[in-house]
């Protein structure tokens, strides 16, 4: 069985409310999520189950509490509807509004109890804030209580204006922001506070496993109890690329096959030299 853990979709109402989300960095236009289209793609490439998520990095950008909640509900309702109609083909990651923690926790409870969703997708930062900060503790408490996985996906970073030329934000900054966000989660002791936390790092975790020895350094006084490496090795890493085969082998040699998940990054994904 092939399960694609990195399968993005854009409901029509979501695109209407965030017009800038209608095109990716290449200028390729997205259209409203269509179940049949996605199922046809899955049949074409032999994918048995697609785990639906949204890139979702723009939701908190304006700091608008009501709009953030509305956008998340649109995403979550759409994905839950797809799962209800095709329960053996679609699974779902919820997106939570991080402007207000009461809204965040309430929406998570709704997604798990009413919508029967299967985990949570969060961007690497929300409007420039990283989710290891103390203000997001209610999110972590609710996530841990639900016992389902957290999928971390790159988003535009606070320093992006320095990287826009030549689209370097897409090529380098996004993997860098994944490395930053996940490292901060580890160093902040999140895995110590929530020992049963299951985390999926998209795009093979950015540069984490390339720089594992450096990430073990104790400068800056990380509060995690164990060597940072021991936490990074508990994380699951998806293959959304393009990724060179040598990098996948490095990940395999470092964490083993059980920690590697298939991800295609549809509809964004593009092949590379080894794809």
Residue ranges and their predicted role:
Residues 1-275:
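Helix-coil boundary/capping segments in enzymes
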């Amino acid at each position: 069985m092939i399960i694609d853990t990195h399968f993005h979709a854009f409901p029509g109402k979501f695109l209407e409310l965030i017009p800038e989300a209608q095109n990716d960095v290449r200028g390729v236009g997205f259209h409203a999520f269509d179940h049949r289209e996605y199922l046809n793609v899955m049949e074409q490439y032999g994918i048995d189950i697609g785990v639906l998520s949204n890139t979702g990095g723009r939701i908190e950008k304006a700091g608008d509490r009501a709009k953030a909640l509305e956008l998340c509900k649109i995403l979550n309702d759409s994905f839950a509807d797809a799962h209800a109609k095709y329960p053996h083909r679609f699974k779902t990651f919820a997106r939570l509004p991080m402007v207000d923690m009461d809204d965040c926790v309430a929406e998570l409870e709704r997604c798990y109890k009413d919508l029967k969703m299967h985990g949570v997708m969060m961007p690497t930062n929300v409007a420039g804030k990283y989710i290891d900060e103390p203000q997001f503790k209610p999110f972590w408490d609710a996530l841990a209580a639900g016992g389902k996985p957290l999928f971390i996906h790159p988003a535009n970073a606070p320093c992006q204006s320095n990287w826009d030329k030549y689209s370097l934000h897409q090529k380098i900054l996004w993997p860098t922001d994944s490395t930053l966000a996940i490292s901060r989660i580890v160093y902040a002791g999140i895995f110590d506070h929530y020992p049963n936390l299951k985390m999926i790092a998209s795009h093979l975790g950015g540069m984490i496993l390339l720089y594992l020895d450096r990430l073990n350094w104790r400068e800056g006084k990380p509060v995690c109890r164990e060597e940072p490496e021991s936490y990074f090795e508990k994380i699951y890493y998806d293959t959304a690329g393009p990724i060179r085969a040598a990098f996948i082998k490095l990940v395999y040699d470092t964490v083993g096959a059980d920690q590697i998940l298939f991800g295609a990054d549809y509809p964004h994904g593009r092949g590379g030299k080894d794809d």
